[in-house]
Structures are given as structure tokens and as C-alpha cells.
Amino acid sequence: MLPTDTAEFLALPHVGVLATLRRGGLPYTVPVWFDWDGEAAWITGTYERVWCRQLLHDPRASLCVEAMAPVAGHVGMDGPVAAHELPEFDIWPISARLVDKYVRRPMGDAAADAFFANMRTEHRLLFRLEPTAFRAIDMRVYRGKRADRQFQARQSGHEEQQQQ
């Protein structure tokens, strides 16, 4: 997937699946809303949620975003998360972007305003996942791993480097 396509894909209200680690090392997955800022994924949660406690204990995580419409694609990213908490960090502007993306666009202002007002009553924090590994596949052109690498190389003008 090209960078512009990836940004457009991640701007849509697709639900992501976040993987965290349990204390014993087993993965724990949970559906999440996220906001991609071009460098990192922002995810909101509450201190009471299991996955939030896991990230506060061990910041390693993976986020998978898969969709079949309007564009069939997949984005996966792995990396450490950093917790951002009140009062040191104002979590509300990013939280408002999440509400706009997932509530306001599909359901309108009244639903979004009510949802956001409820969020502000909860003991919330934000996590910022800055990927150290990133995968993006556009299923419209995907014909297997090798063909995908060749397509990406043609699009970026580096075909000779990817023919290995």
C-alpha cells in the first residue's frame, strides 16, 4: 500500500485489534478505536481496562487494522506504547478526534457530544503506539508477497532493489 493510500485507509473509522501481553507472556487482543497522526497511533482507554493495565506494565503492543470496504486492505504495526495521562498531558483534543472519527461522522453531533461528555466522566488516558515495524497491504493489487514487493518497488521507482 502506498503511503497516501495508507493514510487514507487509516483515516477511515475501521476498528483496530490491539494485542498486548499478559503477565505470563500470552497475547491479549481487544478491539480499539485509534487515530493515526502520520507517525503514531493514538488509542484511548480507562485505567480499569485489562489491556490498559497490561500496557502500563509492559508497553509492547501490536495494532492490526483490517477492512474489506470501501478498500480491502490490511495495516499492521508493532512497537512500544507511551502512556499519556492527565494532568501532565491534555488527552481531550485527541480523544475528541476519536469521537469525531467513530461517532460524529456516522451518527451526528448529538450522539458525539453525548459520547464525549460521558468520556470526560471516566478516568481516562491515552496511549501512543509509535511503530518500529509497519506492514500495509492493498488487497486490490496484492498477488502474494513477492508480487506485492515488486508492485511497491515500481510505485516508488526502486524496482531493481526489490527483485531479490
Q: Residues of each region from the PLM?
A:
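Short beta-strand segments
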Residues: 13-47, 53, 61-67, 74-76
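A short, polar/charged loop/turn motif at coil->beta-strand junctions and beta-hairpin connectors
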Residues: 9-12, 71, 123
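Structural motif corresponding to alpha-helix initiation and N-cap regions
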Residues: 3-4, 48-49, 113
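Charged, gly/pro-rich active-site loop segments
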Residues: 73-164
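Short, basic/aromatic recognition patches
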Residues: 1-17
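Short secondary-structure boundary segments
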Residues: 66-68, 131-132
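Short amphipathic alpha-helical segments and helix-helix/interface helices
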Residues: 6-7, 52, 95, 116
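Acidic-histidine catalytic/liganding microenvironments
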Residues: 58
